[in-house]
Curated annotation (Swiss-Prot):
Name the record gives this protein: Protein SPATA31F3
Family label: Belongs to the SPATA31 family.
Keywords: Membrane, Phosphoprotein, Transmembrane, Transmembrane helix
Transmembrane segments: 11-31
Biased composition (Polar residues): 351-392
Subcellular location: Membrane
Top-level taxon of origin: Eukaryota
Modified residues (Phosphoserine): S152
Bilayer disposition of the protein: Single-pass membrane protein
Pfam families per the UniProt record, alphabetical: DUF4599
Name of the coding gene: SPATA31F3
The keyword Membrane is annotated on this UniProt entry: yes
CC annotations in GO: membrane
Keyword Cytoplasm: no
């Protein structure tokens, strides 16, 4: 019992058991931790990304401020360098470089800004910029005066203005244009300031005269105007009369269409009452149309074909043969219809005789009922339709004769 094997076994058994339990618990804890990490991983990543974005935005704002400050300081540095080196532009040279047109407002404003930057003043302008400012002010005054003049012209009625006043206004406008051009040219030159002031005064004086002429004389309406107004007044009933005519024409057209529809309906009604008439009418129309077509084709061929032709064309032969066969088919169909009608009429005649005689004597019935009814029907049909057969034969002969004459 005191051997070393038993001692080791007694000591090692609980150690192994407790150790295995601890290892299993550690494995379970690790698995749970990994599972939680998988679940919470996206949220943590998103939170980290948001934090990074916020940090970048915070960093960008001071960078942008620094960049803007640097850009604002660059022109000042350049100006300081130009002043130190004596590279500043002379008066009016910037405006000449920008644009040759002295009336350009954009170039004038840019020249003013450049002059302000050069001088370092934001509120007051230098005397060199007085020239462009005067030019711009002159242009503004001229534009405002032209707008007011246009408004005054639009406010006045067109009839009150006469022809001499219109000619005066045109001449004055041309003078105004020349004055504006002279004012614009004078604004560019500082030496001719007095000339520009005089031209502006002249323009204002002419403009005031135009206003007085437009507002003051209010001429009464002439006889021509009254006559034109009297002519214009009765135009309304004339238009009404035209409208009435158009309405009456539309009503007449509608009535004609209704009458045509009624006529078609009556035709259909008569055909519905008498179906025999309907079939006959259709067949007669078909025959007439075909006869007319054949006649037209013959006349056209006779006109087109010269007398010295020896061999006619194949297309003409085919058309002639087709028309001939169509006519023959129509005649055959008409002949068959007439024969059927005659057979029906003969049968209706024989039936009462046979029914009446069968009661009295069987011999009469045998005699009246033949062994071959087909012969009887044929004979009756032949007897009843002698005239249609003759008419159809005569038509066939006529068509054949016309065909031979046309082919020859």
């Amino acid at each position: 019992m005191l051997s070393p094997t038993f001692i080791l076994w007694d000591v090692g058994y609980p150690f192994y058991t407790y150790g295995s339990i601890i290892i299993i618990a550690l494995i379970i804890w690790q698995v749970k931790k990994n599972h939680r990490g998988l679940k919470l991983g996206p949220n943590r990543n998103c939170c980290r990304r948001h934090q990074k974005v916020k940090q970048r935005a915070k960093e960008k704002t001071p960078r942008a401020r620094r960049h803007s400050r640097k850009e604002a300081d660059k022109p000042l540095e350049l100006l300081s360098i130009m002043r130190s080196q004596g590279w500043l532009p002379q008066e009016g040279s910037v405006r000449r470089l920008l644009c040759a047109d002295p009336c350009c407002q954009i170039c004038n404003s840019v020249a003013l800004e450049i002059q302000q930057l050069i001088s370092g003043e934001t509120t007051l302008t230098t005397p060199t910029s007085s020239g462009p400012s005067q030019g711009s002010s002159c242009l503004e005054v001229l534009s405002m005066s032209s707008l007011s003049f246009d408004q005054s012209q639009e406010s006045l009625p067109f009839k009150q203005l006469s022809l001499p006043s219109a000619t005066r206004t045109v001449s004055q406008l041309t003078n105004q244009k020349s004055v504006t051009q002279s004012a614009a040219k004078s604004a560019t030159k500082p030496a001719t300031k007095s000339v520009s002031a005089i031209s502006i005064r002249q323009y204002w004086a002419g403009h005031q005269q135009l206003r007085q002429e437009c507002r003051g004389p209010e001429l009464p309406l002439d006889a021509g105007a009254l006559s034109s107004s009297s002519v214009e007044e009765p135009r309304i009933p004339v238009n009404q009369h035209v409208k009435k005519k158009s309405n009456s024409e539309g009503i007449l057209k509608k009535q004609e269409a209704v009458e045509a529809d009624l006529g078609n309906k009556l035709k259909h009604f008569t055909q519905w009452i008498n179906p025999d008439m309907k079939g006959q009418g259709r067949k007669e129309c078909i025959l007439r149309c075909k006869d007319e077509k054949v006649a037209k084709t013959k006349t056209k061929k006779a006109e087109k074909s010269p007398p010295s032709t020896k061999r006619p064309m194949k297309g003409a032969k085919l058309e002639k043969e087709e028309g001939f066969f169509d006519a023959l088919q129509c005649l055959d169909s008409e002949f068959q219809r007439q024969s059927m009608e005659s057979v029906r009429s003969s049968q209706s005649c024989f039936l009462p005789l046979s029914s009446g005689s069968s009661k009295r004597s069987p011999l009469l019935t045998c005699a009246t009922q033949p062994e071959n009814p087909s012969h009887v029907s044929v004979s009756t049909s032949a007897e009843g339709t002698c005239l249609p057969q003759e008419s159809t034969q005569s038509r066939k002969k006529e068509l054949r004769g016309s065909q031979t004459s046309a082919s020859s």
